[in-house]
């Protein structure tokens, strides 16, 4: 993409009401624009990152055996009355009446809809297990939306729902999602710690939140320090084998959100192992048995010929929220430092002397060669000063900057800058193109 043709409305300063770094930088980098309280338009740069985050989530769900479908944003109120949750959400639920006076709602979550889909189609234990997932926009009418995409009213969520015959099968489904979450957050450069959590209005008796530590986190969290540096399991997993040891390894050490915190148990840890911090929730998983299947009569015929309600689980990831969490965890005074897997562009080509024949030719060569190699390239071909070009590339977080100037061209070299480390080195253009072409930022962990 040539910057001269791109839509990138960057700001020199963030609006005064942007309180946290991620909100400030997303506005300054031209990623989002507020349309109403807690509601944002996703501009081209922000949408590019959102789609890359979504792609990783989708790949890890598919790898773990979940099956994608797409459920409506507008849901029947009667389904929520059937589950008994219609009044639980109170004013956070946006309720709608259509022209036929039917009660509808803008879905804050989708347990009722997916249970309705399941019960209409699956009747026998022989058709289990199933795990269905949905990536869809949700709406919750927050009393005080703030912090940009971190606590908006409209947001993109991935919700997966598992259906099993018995508690043993349900626990295996829970473990698969637990491990899949470790991998997907790791691929985005996040160190997410699973913590025992309150089930809230979703319900159930087993729940973990996945927390990214950050000074601007909305809640206090407490954990053993070793959990922060534990490596993700990676893709080479027998998803239908015994994953309990992997889960045990990450749940044996103390970790809890503020609601579940046990001060005595935490104090029993050696002082040097205790970590108290603020955290951002990026994922939440639940096992809730028959909370929805029983009242909604999602039944299957078991091996004994008797009908039983299925055991269910729910597994959520705040896809749009993840962008804010990544920025909170990875930025500097110059702007965003995207992990390469989710960066809007892999490489920024900077022409320091637009209109100089040799510089123009070298930039065109690099731009076309890197595009042909499958890299996402942003070519700053604007006739502006070099300092402004560097500032823009740093602000939007392009991981690699290929800098072409008349002095370097005369010496037969270009400069390559690493956004994360700030390191620069000079090399012949062909060598730099080969290095950048060989990288695969989207590769699985």
Curated annotation (Swiss-Prot):
Subcellular location: Cytoplasm
Any Gene Ontology biological process: prolyl-tRNA aminoacylation
EC main group: ligase
UniProt keyword terms in alphabetical order: Aminoacyl-tRNA synthetase, ATP-binding, Cytoplasm, Ligase, Nucleotide-binding, Protein biosynthesis
GO cellular component labels: cytosol
SUPFAM superfamilies assigned to the protein according to its UniProt record, in alphabetical order: Class II aaRS ABD-related (SSF52954), Class II aaRS and biotin synthetases (SSF55681)
Covalent S-S links between cysteines: none
Function in brief: Catalyzes the attachment of proline to tRNA(Pro) in a two-step reaction: proline is first activated by ATP to form Pro-AMP and then transferred to the acceptor end of tRNA(Pro).
Protein name: Proline--tRNA ligase
